[in-house]
Amino acid sequence: ALGVDAKSAVRSLAHIESGFGRMERFELGEARVTMVLVKNPAGCDRAIDYLASLPDGVTAVFCLNDEIADGTDVSWIWDAAFERLFEPEKKPMSLIVSGIRAEDMRLRLKYAGADEESIRLIHGVTELIDLIAGCKGDVCILPTYTAMLPLRAELASRCGRKEFWK
């Protein structure tokens, strides 16, 4: 319809990169990292759907901040359906929480059905990225906006990518 043949269209589409933190992928050591920005219950539920679709052995990283750019009210995490990750037929996953409101996220996961003792709490970005670098297989990071910024910068640096703004 646009006068573009299918082969050209496919070649062009192969070069499209995902947007800043929106299903953005990184290879870090043996970890296949996907970053999925979350900002509200509806978007978080879609990220949970994606996370639940990943194969066994996935590592889930939840990074929750409450800075102005995130919105200072994080009560929305109670409206997201984290329970779907812990239904009896679901495969177990490694859980990590980080960010300014990591303790709130840990509590939310506990009430969703996660074993609280199995949830790792990591405060520093460097420590978190070091931990992710030691993972094998799929790692899915679900950060809020201000949590994503330093994580993405460190991942980009370690993976030899340019800063998003450059």
Task: Please give the residue ranges for each predicted region.
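ATP-dependent carboxylate-amine ligase
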Residues: L2-K7, R11-K166
